[in-house]
Every structure is written in C-alpha cells, then in structure tokens.
Amino acid sequence: MMLKDNILEYVPKRPCPVASCCFATPAEPVDVKALIPDANLRRRMGPLLRLAAACGMSALENVDTGNVAGIITSTGLGFMKDTVSFADMLIDRNEEMLNPSPFMQSTFNTVSGYIALLGGIRTYNTAYVHRSGGFAAALTDAMMLVEDTGRNVLAGGFDEASPEVDEYRRKLGCWKRGDFLPLGEGAGFLCLGGGDNGVRILGVHSSCHTLEFDRKVLCSSYIDRLGAFFSILPVVLCIVIGQRPEGRILVVDDVNPSGPAVLLEID
C-alpha cells in the first residue's frame, strides 16, 4: 500500500480472486424475502437497509460463512433519512422519550451488522465512510485481510436516494454537469478470496483522474440506468463482472470528485 499526494494506491501481493458478487437497486432488486425470511425483521428495516443486507447475503449465498474472515462495508452518506429523523426527534422532544429505531437504523455499520447477524458470522466487522473514497478503503482493507488469512472477506458499498440527500447534493453542487444528474441509490457487494474462478482484482487507486488505461469502463456510462450516488463504483463493478469481458479492465468512478478506480482481470 502506498500513500502519495493523499492518493491511496494498493496492489495486492497476488491478484485477489472474486468468489462472487451481487448488486441491487430499487429497479433491479434481489429477492429480499428469500434472503431475509424473518418477516418481523424485514418490517423493522428501512428500504435501503433491507436492500443492502439482502444484497450482501446474496453475495454470500454459495460461500461457507464459517470461512468468512470479515465483513467490510462503505457508504458515502449512510442513512440520511433516518439520521435527519432522529436529529429532528432530539430537538422536537427535548432529548426525552425518544424512539430508538431511527438511531439504530442511521448508524453507518448497520448493514454490516445485519449481515453478520443473518449469516451468524462473528468476525472482523467494520464500515468506512468518506463519500466515494470509502469504498477504496473498504476494498483495500478486504484484500489485505484476504492476504493475511487466506479466507473469504465480504466487501461492499451502499447509498440511498432521499429528499435529504437531494437537498445535501444541491447545496454542495454534487453530481452536476450543467444540470444536476438524476439521483440514484443501490448496493454492491463482492466476496473476495477462495478459489480462482476467473475474476481477480489487481489493484485499487483512490483517485481515478490521474490514470490512463487502454480499456476503461466509466461509471458515468451507467447514469441513465443507475443514477448518480457516492457508492456507484461497487454496483458497476458487479455489473461488469457479470458481463465477463475478457482481459484487464479499469473500472473508473468518474461520477464523483476524485472517485476511485479498480483494476480487474477477467478470463
């Protein structure tokens, strides 16, 4: 791992295999009921939490959960709707008689915690939050853990579209090219490690804007399908892996300022 000019570069000692992956969006969901069979649990979860947790469980569907060394998630903004709801409640009720549900569902590690509970996985569990840069850190951490343990590690990212996120991005001018880009949401998870099934990660670069590469897949080419959000890169990675283009492909988050890039090798 190397840090130069505040840009993180990580190249694993050996190419890191991708055992499986899954992405989910409101328009292209996974089967939440099958992956989270407890109806009471589903009812207590917000829409994005259900979607992201089910997406993570789907990526682990054909993996021995006893061989999972860690669950590492990332998010740009987390659950803004629940965060604002809890903050408003604190003010309106003068910090008394608070409903704990919005707080529990607003914490950044809620998704990784639910995946661990659903899969009975009692191992390393953490979340990275830094706009689009969180996924580069999460994926780097996951690959280092695969190298250290030789076991599977789940890594992914998620973000929501809500009025709160829309207000935030308009104030900061995020995702604007002339006019504002359509707002999107979704989750993408990759299960790393295990046997080589023909998909490998060769490296992570936390700022794609300094990179030149012959074969690039730009996240901006998926805006019409996905919309714009901080965690678009893990979703596009899963889509590209599902298409199985052969060779080395650099998947670039050019939607977000200083967005990261991931170099894949597929055969």
Regions found by a protein language model. Give the residues of each.
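Short-chain dehydrogenase/reductase
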Residues: 139
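Conserved "HGTGT" condensation-loop signature of ketosynthase/thiolase-family condensing enzymes
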Residues: 1-129, 133-136, 144-151, 155-267
